[in-house]
Amino acid sequence: EIEQAKQDIDIRTFRQEFEGTFENYAGAVYYNFHPVDNVVKRQIDWTKPLHIGMDFNVDPMSACVSQIEKDKVYFVDEVIIYGSNTDEMVQEIRDRYGTKMQIFIYPDPASKQRKTSAGGRTDLSILQNAGFKVKVKHKHPAIRDRVNAVNSRLKDSKGERHIFVSQSCKTLIKGLQRQIYKENTNIPDKEDGFDHMNDALGYMIDYLKPLTTQANFSSPTRWTMK
């Protein structure tokens, strides 16, 4: 299990979880993001499915749009709508990408109960009724686990990167660069608004390639659909 963990997680997370070292949380939440090595020129391939992470904060509602190739994920677009609801997000996605592409949505697990639109419908049911393939966990992952999952895909222990962001996704890039921890805590700061797109990305990555602080890595999840 330890050898598998070395392959699946980044060095800092490995030291913290397996060697019992104290890791200072000061500074950037997504410390493995590099504005050159993780940023690429990339456009949507209209022949391949879309994988969209989604955060349901209504101001703004945020979605990061990606495509997966083998063990790498490329974020190629982002959707940001202020003062919005799930119906409007669905319409925007359909307007941008049409109805012919296969679309997977990875929303906030709170979507099972949360209702940002009228009519008593949950956010999850709206996405499902729109024809999207919705992939969601039964409950929220620990914030620490979700952040570790993202950092371990931004750069793993071998120095390999598995998450890439198109230059056009300026909000996502800014968020990954600038979100920091609250002083003297391991809680990501949400005051500056960098959290929404980061959370959207995190829900998707945590679903596809989860890590846990219990480090149960004997059967790692690859970039495949459950």
Which role fits each region the language model picked out?
Residues 41, 210-221:
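Intrinsic-disorder/low-complexity linker and hinge segments
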Residues 1-54, 59:
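ATPase catalytic-site recognition across NTP-hydrolyzing enzymes
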Residues 191-212:
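Acidic, Mg2+-coordinating catalytic module of metal-dependent nucleases/exonucleases
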Residues 34-39, 219-226:
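Amphipathic alpha-helical surface "interface" segments used
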Residues 40-84:
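Acidic, glycine-rich loop-and-beta core segments that form the ion-binding/anion-interacting portion
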Residues 64, 70-188, 211-212, 222-226:
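Mg2+-dependent endonuclease catalytic cores in nucleic-acid-processing enzymes, primarily RNase H-like
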Residues 1-5, 187-193:
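Short, polar loop/linker segments at the starts of domains and inter-domain junctions
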